[in-house]
């Protein structure tokens, strides 16, 4: 009996020792903490997974956005190239159209100029025709009156203030031009007023033209005897100068109209146009 009691006591001691080794049983608060930690771990894992999913989605969308951006850049580049090509083509077409317009404008201007010249020429022909008809009528009247009185200029001569003028279309030296006028019962033109000067300029144009003024025999004289010193003069500045530097020998002894209408002395051998003049009552 005592042995059994000792064995039982020993067994109880072993159980107590085993319990001491294992520690005290877990309390409810500890279990709650363990459960709470598991939940936190699970929540953290879930959040990590969710975050990973979000990152994957964002990465996928970012990749798609990059592809879209590259596509947009390519489309923009293609559009830019296409636009530049179209602009160049339009510029080329515009330049071509501009050249064609300038060509058309040039042609129109030339045609207008030709028409103006033709119109002016036609008017001159009409005026000349009227003058010729008038001269012919005048000559017929003079013929019927046995030529006792002249009331108009010969054909191709121009009447002005009681004188008749003939304008050459060829050129001759001063002496030959003067002889030609004498054969027409006239003389080289003698300019006696500003009005006559203007009349002559309108008919001559801007051409060098001999007039009946010379100093070959001394002082300047008009061929018809008109007084030079007290009469009308229209020399260019510093003229006459009797210049010897022309290399043609001698000085300058004959006067002529210059291109602006003023007078200049020159070598008489130069070939210029000329104007003949005669009084209306002396015209043939």
Swiss-Prot record:
Domain C-type lectin: 160-277
Side Cytoplasmic, residues: 1-39
Topology term for the membrane: Single-pass type II membrane protein
Record's protein name: Asialoglycoprotein receptor 1
SUPFAM superfamilies: C-type lectin-like (SSF56436)
Motif Endocytosis signal per record, residues: 5-8
Lipidation (S-palmitoyl cysteine): 35
Assembly description: Interacts with LASS2.
UniProt modification remark: Phosphorylated on a cytoplasmic Ser residue.
Residue numbers binding Ca(2+) 1: 190, 196, 277
Extracellular-facing ranges: 61-284
Gene behind this protein: Asgr1
Any one biological process term the GO annotation gives: endocytosis
GO cellular component labels: membrane
Residues given in the record as Ca(2+) 2 binding sites: 215, 252-253
InterPro entries according to UniProt: C-type_lectin-like, C-type_lectin-like/link_sf, C-type_lectin/snaclec_domain, C-type_lectin_CS, CD209-like_CTLD, CTDL_fold
